[in-house]
Design a protein with these regions (language model features):
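An active-site-proximal structural segment forming one wall of the substrate-binding cleft
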Residues: 58-76, 92-123, 130-161, 174-187
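Surface-exposed, active-site-proximal loop segments in enzymatic domains
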Residues: 47-55, 84-101, 123-138, 240-244, ...
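Bacterial N-terminal signal peptides
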Residues: 10-20
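Extracellular glycoside hydrolase catalytic/binding regions
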Residues: 55-60, 135, 143-160, 165-303, ...
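Catalytic domains of carbohydrate-active enzymes, especially glycoside hydrolases
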Residues: 61-83, 258-265, 300
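Solvent-exposed loop/turn segments at secondary-structure junctions
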Residues: 42-47, 77, 83-88, 123-127, ...
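Bacterial N-terminal signal peptides that target proteins for export
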Residues: 1-12
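N-terminal carbohydrate-binding accessory modules
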Residues: 25-77, 93, 332-337, 341-346
Length: 349
């Protein structure tokens, strides 16, 4: 390339940049917060079978008061599930302005109360029931929505990370391919923020090594991937917590569910994160098991996001929102771990 051509191209880039048409590529690396306890602020993903649904009727975005209350209690990081079909009603097309505006408000509320947000595409590796990588939902369509997410929100100071897919399942072959497409899409816009990668098998920490060897082949030009697992203590790990799940109860059940994930991370030199964990409020044995799990996570410097906070949970036994102003039993355990961390980086260590 000649010097004259280089000069002309440089001039063109400056002109495009000044007009706001050059691609934005954020390059200053941001670290993921080391706060041990965060919360899932759910509601925007309620009633996914009702599409598009109505805000305030079928799905709910937390009001500013939620952010104010939890910030005052020391919560600094929230995971915020959003639904692809509501965000992008047609594949490859523009984002829905109503849903976008509500996400804007979410990030603004978080900024106001000094909280960090992980945007979580809460879709189980599917769009309208069709798996990514199928004829109906191409890998390129998945990359498109993540690129649009990054383009829309990468400049917001409250956005701390992208969780590029919640709980992929029954997709051993497709998920690593999709994940690479998702990483590439985000990195075409934002090389600063971490990308959280969940695992096939509903992101189960216990099943992680069985289904996720291929994730070790993922490439990130920013070298800022974090693997994110989920931990529930009931028999099938699905978070239903039936009475039979207390038969032959083991207070270390959470630690046993966690260990395969921790071992995998250490073996391969990867960083880890727990995107969901939670217990019901109807038996103190679950609280004791959660306490033990959190002590183990604190030792390893692995942050964990409780499922769940947010509006309109009703009598859902895992919910952490106060009832008539009274804290839920789970909070007595969680608040023990809501304090400044001595961890300098994410573990395990």
């Amino acid at each position: 390339m000649t010097l004259r051509l280089k000069s002309a191209l440089a001039t063109l880039f400056v002109l495009l940049f000044s007009l706001g048409t050059a691609p934005a590529l954020q390059a200053d690396t941001r670290d993921f917060p080391t706060d041990l306890i965060g919360l899932n602020f759910s509601g925007a993903g309620f009633a996914p079978q009702v599409l598009p649904g109505k805000p305030g009727t079928n799905y709910f975005f937390p009001e500013a008061s939620h952010y104010r209350r939890w910030s005052a209690k020391g919560i600094r990081v929230i995971r915020f599930p959003i639904i692809w079909e509501r965000l992008q009603p047609q594949l490859g097309k523009d984002l829905d302005p109503t849903y976008v505006k509500l996400i804007d408000q979410t990030l603004d509320n978080a900024k106001r109360y000094r909280m960090n947000v992980v945007l979580d595409l809460h879709n189980y590796m599917r769009y309208r029931g069709q798996i990514i990588g199928s004829q109906a939902v191409s890998y390129q369509a998945y990359a498109d929505v993540l690129r649009r997410i990054a383009q829309r929100w990468h400049g917001h100071p409250a956005l701390v990370a992208y969780d590029i897919m919640n709980e992929p399942h029954d997709a051993v072959e497709q998920w690593p391919i999709a994940a690479q497409h998702g990483i590439d899409a985000v990195r075409s816009v934002d090389r600063a923020r971490p990308i959280l990668v969940e695992g096939n098998g509903w992101s189960s920490s216990y099943l992680w090594p069985r289904y996720n060897a291929k994730l070790l082949e993922l490439k990130d030009p920013a070298d800022n991937l974090i693997f994110s697992a989920h931990v529930y203590f009931d028999n099938d790990g699905g978070g239903k917590y039936l009475k039979k799940d207390l038969t032959a109860f083991d207070p270390d059940v959470g630690i046993r569910r966690l260990e395969p994930f921790i071992t995998w991370l250490k073996q391969h030199g990867k960083r880890g994160h727990i995107g969901e964990f939670g217990v019901p409020d109807n038996d103190p044995r679950w609280l004791a098991a959660m306490d033990r799990l959190l002590a183990r996570l604190r030792k390893e410097c692995i942050p964990a996001m409780y499922w769940a906070a947010g509006p309109n949970w009703g009598d859902y036994p895992l919910a952490i929102e106060p009832v008539n102003g009274k804290p839920r039993p789970q909070w007595a355990v969680l608040q023990k771990y809501v304090k400044p961390s001595d961890c300098e980086t994410l573990g395990p260590r």
